[in-house]
Design a protein with these regions (language model features):
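Short hydrophobic/aromatic patch on the recognition helix
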Residues: 50-60
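Hydrophobic alpha-helical connector segments
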Residues: 69, 82-111, 185
Length: 211
């Protein structure tokens, strides 16, 4: 099995700097969850984290970079879970189970930070696809698809499975159309069902004829 590495891992830093970073990112995440990213200021984050506002600016520079740090923090946890975590999301489960677990977990991850991910994916038309996280997701899905259906175009199908989880479409379905998260996941299951081979079997009707 090809080993995957977590994308965008943090560089080594002093213990006190790392502690301050965790406090700031955690405080920012909580404030954003309550008020939305546009309503959160650096001053508020500093107060909630118990650090000086200068520390926040020195560490992150501006609010946009702080927002991306909140995304990255959650992203590293997600990547670690599907690369190193327990099955079925992590290694050790059959490929069809890992495929389903990954897409469900990615739906949960998108649900948790949909507005922030829309911001991150805005910009150039290919912004989403140039992100290192997308490349890792694509590689992971292509690997699993190659085990589920050897010989298929895994590169194309990996893109096809990731397309419904683009943050802007996901947010439109959840907020505008009012789709429950369970419905989104059921739709993903239907896509997977079209890819997972079904063993040949003989079905008998009540008359005794083989179908």
């Amino acid at each position: 099995m090809r080993e995957l590495c977590v994308v965008g891992g943090p560089s080594p830093e002093r213990a006190d700097a790392a502690l301050n970073r965790r406090r700031i990112v955690r405080a920012a995440a909580e404030l954003i969850a309550r008020h939305g990213p546009e309503a959160v200021s650096m001053d508020e984050v500093a107060r909630a984290a118990g650090v000086g506002v200068g520390t926040v600016y020195r560490r992150f520079g501006d609010r946009a970079r702080l927002v991306y740090a909140v995304i990255d923090d959650r992203e590293r946890d997600f990547q670690d879970a599907f690369i190193h975590g327990p099955p079925p999301l992590g290694p050790g489960a059959p490929a069809p189970e890992r495929l389903r677990a990954f897409l469900h977990a990615l739906a949960d991850r998108t649900e948790a930070q949909a507005e922030l991910l829309v911001m991150a994916e805005s910009g150039p038309p290919d912004a989403r696809f140039r992100d290192g996280s997308y490349a890792l997701y694509h590689m992971h899905l292509a690997m699993l698809l190659g085990r589920v259906r050897p010989g298929v175009d895994t590169a194309y199908l990996a893109d096809a499975l990731l397309a419904p989880l683009a943050a802007n479409l996901f947010l439109h379905q959840r907020r505008t159309r009012g789709m429950p998260l369970d419905r989104v996941k059921a739709g993903l299951d239907a896509l997977i069902a079209g890819l997972v081979p079904v063993p040949n079997r003989t079905v008998h009707d009540p008359s005794g004829e083989s179908l």
